Each structure stands twice: as C-alpha cells, then as structure tokens.
UniProtKB/Swiss-Prot annotation:
Protein family: Belongs to the universal ribosomal protein uL23 family.
Classification via Pfam families: Ribosomal_L23
GO MF entry, a single one: structural constituent of ribosome
Known function: This protein binds to a specific region on the 26S rRNA.
GO CC field: ribonucleoprotein complex; ribosome
Region Disordered: start-end pairs: 1-41
NCBIfam families with a match to the protein in the record: PRK14548.1, uL23_arch
Keyword Ribosomal protein attached: yes
Biological process, per Gene Ontology: translation
Name of the protein in its database record: Large ribosomal subunit protein uL23
Bilayer-crossing regions: none
Length: 164
C-alpha cells in the first residue's frame, strides 16, 4: 500500500510542472497551439441482458432480387384430357352400370376434380354428362362414375371406345 501512495504522490509532482510549462508556452506562443482539437470518443451504454438465453437482434435484410431464368421457353400445360382420364373399367359391375344406369366408369387422375373430369369426357368422347361421382379406391386410384344425359347412350359410347 505505501508503494502505491508514493507513486501517486510522485506522479502528482511530475504533472504539476508540465502543466505550468504548457501554460507559459500557450501564453507566449501562438493561440492556435492552445486551441488544439481533442479527439472525442463516444461510448454507448449497452443493454444488460437479464434473460438466460441470448436472442440475436433483428438486422437489416436486403429484399431478394428476382433473377431472370436462363431457360425462357413456353411452359407447356401437362394437365390435359388424356392425363385426367386414365382408362375405362371393364369389370362386371361397370358393364352392369353401362346397361342399367347409362353410366360409364373410368379410372382418373387422383388430383382431378369433378368439373375437370366432366370437361375431359366432353372433349374426348363428345357426350354430355349429367353428373360425376368419384371415389378413391383402397389401392389409391380414383374411380369416376360418369352418368350420361338421356340423349346419349352409354352402350353406344362404350362400343365406340371398344369396351363391349
């Protein structure tokens, strides 16, 4: 402890004459030397984190720029009537529906809805449909029962398709 006190006293003695010398120079010399700019360092107070987990603060994220694709070609619509209607069913139950209920039975794409199925049948076989019933079979395929209007015969349409 006494060593620290002695060094502090020595530094006070040394600093006093320097300040006195600098005051004399400032009085005699140019006033520009006295008005020397001092460098100011600003210290911002940091927030103390009181939570046990550190959460990174949000920083600026530049919005993404859309890059033009190098392969600029016309996108082809792969969802057409031939993709929607896969194939007709020729089981005994399907044949009975053709004869008694004027209904055709098809396996269709599992993502197709009833209106798309109706439009595809109209395009492929040129017949009007009254309604479309669909079900998903246990094997994952979608079956569609297409009831034709009274002006069209399901048996004639099946003959044109080559079912009967």
């Amino acid at each position: 402890m006494p060593a620290k006190a002695a060094s502090a006293a020595a530094s006070k003695k040394n600093s006093a004459p320097k300040s006195a010398v600098s005051k004399k120079v400032a009085k005699k010399g140019a006033p520009a030397a006295a008005a020397k700019p001092t460098k100011v360092v600003k210290v911002t107070k940091r927030k103390a984190y009181t939570r046990p987990q550190f959460r990174r603060p949000h920083t600026y994220r530049r919005p993404a720029t859309v890059k033009p694709s190098s392969n600029v070609s016309a996108i082809k619509n792969k969802w057409d009537a031939f993709r929607i209607i896969r194939y007709p069913l020729t089981t005994d139950k399907a044949m009975k529906k053709i004869e008694e209920n004027n209904t055709l039975t098809f396996i269709v794409d599992s993502r197709a809805n009833k209106t798309e199925i109706k439009k595809a049948i109209r395009k492929l076989y040129q017949v009007k449909t009254v309604k479309v019933n669909t079900l998903i079979r246990p094997d994952g395929l979608k079956k569609a029962y297409i009831r034709l209007s009274a002006s069209y015969d399901a048996l004639d349409t099946a003959n044109k398709m080559g079912l009967v």
